[in-house]
Amino acid sequence: MNCTFLDDNIIRIGDNALIAPNVQIYTAFHPTNAIDRFGVPKEDGSFEFCKTQTAPVIIGNNVWIGGGAIIMPGVTIGNNVVIGAGSVVTKDVPDNVIAYGNPCRVVRENK
């Protein structure tokens, strides 16, 4: 319910994954430099806009992503992982852990 999947690249979701409401998964991002992001005017008056960059998101098996979590481009979430509600996942998460926060970080092992 109310999830957003921006799939300009691959989003691979493993078996038995549970994705709670309002989760956002992004595969696209823009340059941080303003000129690169907004484009450069050409001699003819037209604009050359930036190209969106993308990176895949991989979600392992037996993963639970809590409500309102945001998964950023290029992230891999391992198997048997719990991502806490409201987390912002900016880096890979290894197998068999519970992770949460902004930014998301491993808190403990998931046995």
Report each predicted region and the residues it spans:
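Flexible, glycine/small-residue-enriched loop-and-beta-strand segment within the central core
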Residues: 1-75, 102-103, 110-111
